[in-house]
Amino acid sequence: GIANPLSVRWDARGRMFVACSDVYPQIEPGVMPDDKVIMLEDKNTDGYADKSSVFASGLNIPTGMEVGIDGVYVGHNTELLHFDWNGNRKLLLSGFGNGDSHQTMNSFAWSPGGELWFCQGDGVESRVETPFGVSSLFQAGVYRLRPDELKLDPLLDDFMGPGNPWGVAFDDYGQSFVIDGAGGVSYLTPASIPAKRRLRLPRIGKPGGYCGIDCLGASNLPAEMAGDFLIGDYIFDCKKNALIINKEFQNIYILQLNLNKEYEQIRKKILH
């Protein structure tokens, strides 16, 4: 069944994939992790899942997951894995940091250019062997992966941006933004080219406890909200567990989602 869901995605057939963890937040001595990705299907198209199956197993706290054209990408512990649609498992990259299970690679998101972006917090250090050499990220930052060639670019190392990033989003112009679990939103685009000169990105808006971000643009939303940010706020009570912040950060709209305070929101996504 579904236990401690960490990530949810849908494929083009409407199937839901849920990354779950029984051992979160850490493994007990002598225990072999067997976390799973559960696939839920609506066979009779009534809007409710009527079939549940294990798509992937043998995982260790899968904090990152994203559906691609050729299968599902899963980040767990120190490894980035790929599962084809038959569930066959392939190790793509290893060497990601696992010093803190709350800050391991997370918040997988596709860019408009077909790159896979994901975050890591400042409690881990990564040294990943790639076909292009070692890709290192020693503190909080963002990774950009080109899956076809396994080129992995580390961005925002050495506290250039958020200390605990948990979400990346793109607007209609392809600009990138990152959300901080202990801060606000940072404009990520200026740091999209790896550089040796370390300049800290300015923070957009007020600091807070945020997790998950999306840029609004769905046609079923008011036109004046286009380009605004939808973010999760996990610090306060359930009366303030999602916010819509406009582009100029002048107005904040509080959404009531009626979520249990024991569950933190990880990713915000508006379905078009």
Language model regions located:
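Beta-propeller domains with acidic blade repeats across secreted/periplasmic ectodomains
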Residues: 1-272
